[in-house]
């Protein structure tokens, strides 16, 4: 059986932490920011963990 390939789109969007959690960037922070409030853009800053329902699916895309 050939080697399993990592899903290249998922590898660009998700990272695995040292403890095994999967993290992602928050949406709505790329462009058209001038009409979004500073409070909203601060809230969208940084990374967050992937929802528990999605972790199994994302791990399979990342060959885990």
UniProtKB/Swiss-Prot annotation:
Organism source for this protein?
Answer: Mycobacterium marinum (strain ATCC BAA-535 / M)
A GO term for molecular function:
structural constituent of ribosome
Q: According to its record, what are the GO cellular component terms?
A: cytosolic large ribosomal subunit
Q: Where is this region: Disordered?
A: 1-64
Name of the protein in question: Large ribosomal subunit protein bL35
Q: Name one Pfam family in it.
A: Ribosomal_L35p
What keyword terms does UniProt attach to this protein?
Ribonucleoprotein, Ribosomal protein
Gene3D superfamilies documented for this protein: 4.10.410.60
Q: Does the keyword Ribonucleoprotein apply?
A: yes
Q: Which GO terms describe its biological process?
A: translation
Q: Known InterPro entries for this protein?
A: Ribosomal_bL35 (IPR001706), Ribosomal_bL35-like (IPR021137), Ribosomal_bL35_CS (IPR018265), Ribosomal_bL35_sf (IPR037229)
Note the SUPFAM superfamilies from the entry.
L35p-like (SSF143034)
Give the domain of life. Bacteria
Please tell me whether the keyword Oxidoreductase is annotated for this protein. no
Basic residues bias: where?
1-42
